UniProtKB/Swiss-Prot annotation:
Residues 1-2 are extracellular. The chain crosses the membrane at residues 3-21. Residues 108-185, 243-375, 402-529 form a coiled coil. Residues 22-567 are cytoplasmic. GO terms for cellular component: plasma membrane; septin ring. The gene is ezrA. It is a single-pass membrane protein. It comes from the Bacteria. Negative regulator of FtsZ ring formation; modulates the frequency and position of FtsZ ring formation. Inhibits FtsZ ring formation at polar sites. Interacts either with FtsZ or with one of its binding partners to promote depolymerization. The keyword Membrane applies. Keywords: Cell cycle, Cell division, Cell membrane, Coiled coil, Membrane, Septation, Transmembrane, Transmembrane helix. This is Septation ring formation regulator EzrA.
Length: 567
């Protein structure tokens, strides 16, 4: 029983697959059948009939016969073959020979594609032929009119073309022969060949018109304009040479020889070969070269004027530097008697003197070159610019060194003034301590005050020791200033602390009789106070009073600050 059921299932599956494959094949057969009918219904005969108004000879006749033969072959051979193959495909499908049916369908598609492609080629060739004939009828009138215009212009200005006239007339005659050949090909039905000939004559006439427009100017350039420019350049060169300008580095004679050869080549290309493009290119190159040579001559003139203008100024600046050097050298000798110059300062003076030597050497070198006959001004500009840079550098070195010499005296006066201020500050601080009612001064503060006094004394000795070493003086003065200012700040802080302690203890005395612990703490604070331990005294007194009367210490300190601000 199970075997029978399995067999039935297999048969049903095979039937379903076969049905599905047959359905797809019949669907493809229907598609190819529709394609075949579409090809058969193409209006090829109607399209071919479009050329019947043309002359049925030559190319046109050949095209017509070939197109008709190809269409007949499609209708009588290809499509019947397709019909036969479609029938075969149906038979193979009905017999479940699906693989064979697919092969036949592929072959049918290839046949239909080939037929379709052949038809498209025919339609394109028909369109090209008809278009060529239509376009030829339009263009021939324009080309003939252009021919008449070119001939008229050539005859009207024949005197401008010289020996080129014969060659241009020959080209024009060839264009006319081409027009006549076009008409012959058209008469013979060769419309596409005639199209190519017509386009060729159109291009030929365009080129001739271009020649007519450009040749006169190019001939004038070759025979008059450019030779005149070269002669003018040569005359200018000779005139500058006679005025004493050194121009050998420009090598104009050699350049003129080269340019004249190029001019002859351009003329040959123009006259013998009618090669306007290359001749124009050479003439443009010659024009650029002439402009470059003029730029070089102009640069030489400008360089000469600039050197003649700048050399006296640079000479004067150098002489001023030498005078400054003599003056500063004497001033340096005097300064050395009172001040000790550092190695860096002395190096500045040496660098300045070395730069002066370089300037003198370079200036001598430039003057020697200016006296020679073969040195161009433009070749000296770099050295002139270098000389100016050297002079500017030397002036900067001199100004820096001289400014430092002048600053030494200012530094000394400033140091003495600062030292006097430090002495006054320290004296006032000591006097303030003596006038205050404090029990005494802590030992460490006394030591700092004595150290400050000693440092002031050392700076004073440095200022009396000649020659002065100002860097050392300034360093010691800075250290002394820092120490004195620290002593002053600590003294003010200590006196303020003493006043705070007295205010707090005085306030705490209100509670001593009632608070035994507070009384003992205040006694300890007083003991430390008279032992010069003001920080410890403040801490104990403030803690005790704050405990007895919270917020009181802060109010006392605020009151003190307010009173100090109004003093």
């Amino acid at each position: 029983m199970e075997f029978i059921i399995g067999l039935i299932v297999i048969l049903l599956a095979l039937f379903s697959v076969g049905y599905f494959l047959r359905k797809n094949i019949y669907k493809e057969i229907d598609r190819l059948e529709a394609w075949k009918i579409e090809i058969l219904n193409r209006s090829i005969v109607e399209e071919i009939s479009k050329i019947k108004h043309l002359k049925m000879t030559g190319e046109t006749e050949q095209f017509f016969e070939r197109w008709r033969a190809e269409w007949d072959d499609i209708v009588t051979a290809h499509l019947p073959k397709v019909e036969e193959l479609l029938y075969d495909a149906e038979e193979y499908s009905d017999k479940y020979r699906f693989s064979k049916a697919k092969q036949v369908l592929t072959h049918i598609e290839d046949l239909l594609s080939a037929a379709d492609s052949n038809i498209e080629d025919i339609l394109k060739e028909i369109a090209d032929l008809v278009t060529s004939e239509e376009q030829n009828r339009k263009d021939i009138e324009k080309v003939k009119e252009q021919y008449q215009t070119v001939r008229k212009n050539l005859l009207a200005y024949s005197h401008l073309y010289g020996t080129l006239y014969d060659k241009m007339e020959q080209d024009l005659d060839e264009a006319w022969e081409g027009i006549k050949q076009y008409e012959e090909e058209t008469e013979n039905g060769n419309y596409m060949k005639a199209r190519k000939i017509l386009l060729e004559q159109d291009r030929r006439l365009d080129q001739l018109q271009l020649y007519i427009n450009d040749v006169p100017k190019l001939i004038a350039d070759c025979k008059q304009t450019v030779p005149g420019q070269l002669t003018k350049l040569k005359d200018g060169y000779q005139e500058m040479s006679e005025k004493g300008y050194k121009l050998e580095h420009i090598q104009i004679t050699k350049e003129l020889e080269t340019l004249n050869k190029q001019l002859a080549r351009a003329e040959k290309l123009l006259i013998d070969e009618l090669n306007l493009e290359e001749a124009s290119s050479i003439l443009q190159m010659i024009d650029d070269a002439i402009e470059t040579l003029y730029d070089q001559l102009e640069a030489e003139v400008e360089a000469g004027q600039e050197i003649k203008s700048r050399m006296p100024e640079l000479t004067e600046a150098f002489e001023k530097l030498e005078q400054d050097h003599t003056q500063t050298k004497a001033e340096t000798a005097l300064v050395k008697e009172s001040y000790k110059l550092t190695a860096g300062e002395l190096d500045q003076q040496k660098a300045f003197e070395k730069r002066l030597e370089e300037i003198e050497k370079l200036m001598k070198q430039i003057r020697e070159k200016l006296d020679r006959d073969h040195v161009a001004y433009s070749l000296l500009m770099d050295e002139i610019n270098q000389l100016e840079t050297f002079i500017e550098d030397a002036k900067a070195l001199h100004d820096t060194f001289k400014g430092h010499l002048q600053s030494l005296r200012k530094e000394e006066l400033q140091a003495r003034e600062t030292l006097a201020e430090l002495k006054t500050m320290l004296t006032d601080t000591v006097r303030q301590l003596h006038k205050s009612n404090i029990p005494g001064v802590p030992a460490e503060m006394k030591e700092r005050a004595e150290k400050a006094q000693e440092m002031i004394h050392q700076v004073h000795e440095q200022l009396e020791n000649l020659p002065l070493n100002m860097p050392a003086v300034n360093q010691q003065l800075k250290e002394a200033s820092d120490t004195v200012r620290n002593v002053v700040d600590e003294t003010e802080e200590m006196l303020s602390k003493v006043d705070q302690i007295e205010r707090i203890i005085q306030y705490g005395n209100r509670f001593r009789s009632q608070n035994h612990i507070l009384s003992e703490q205040l006694k300890e604070a007083e003991r430390r106070f008279y032992a010069y331990d003001y920080n410890g005294s403040f801490d104990i007194a403030a803690a005790a009073v704050e405990k007895a009367s919270p917020g009181a210490v802060q109010k006392l300190l605020a009151q003190q600050e307010k009173e100090y601000q109004h003093q």
